Amino acid sequence: MMKNKEIIERIKSKKAFISDMDGVIYHGNKLLPGVPEFVEWLKKEGKKFLFLTNSSERTPRELQEKMSRLGIDLEENVFYTSALATAHFLAAQRPGGTAYIIGEAGLINAMYNAGYTMNNYNPDYVVVGDTRSYSFEKIEQAVNLVLKGAKLIGTNPDLTGPVENGIIPATKALISPIELATGRQAYFVGKPNPPDDADCPQADRLFQ
């Protein structure tokens, strides 16, 4: 069995690092202990690194700004979200497609930038991500669109997400009523699904 010192030295020898964010880098709006020192070490040692999040709410720019508010300055291209993974996956499946989206700016912007058009009438996909603006009307519309043939996609399979005062319902919890009402199972793109399902150009650039 390796001792702690051996484990630390083995970690230090790595050239690149990929880290989760929610519950690893921060919890809500609080950095977790050791994070500033870890990020500073990554920069000082010239390590390549990428921060991944299954949350689809924020854009990479918004994540960059959040980290800056918490006292850590990073480049925008070190963040990769489940919204980006979903957009890249769907763009590969059906380039220039259409989607009805239940989600926040992070998901809407990612889909738009991937060449998708928003469509509330006869979309190729109904895409559900993390959101705080959930409503019965949106569920009703999503249900009817799926019954008409739209494929149901979730940005991640998480039931809940951590916040400072507890947890919040995440994508799998939000998409469940649509699955139950339609009898259709959603396809989820984010972790822990295989990385082949979603291209990650940020990783390609950083780790080449």
Positions of predicted regions on the chain:
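HAD-like aspartate-dependent phosphatase fold
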Residues: 1-21, 25-208
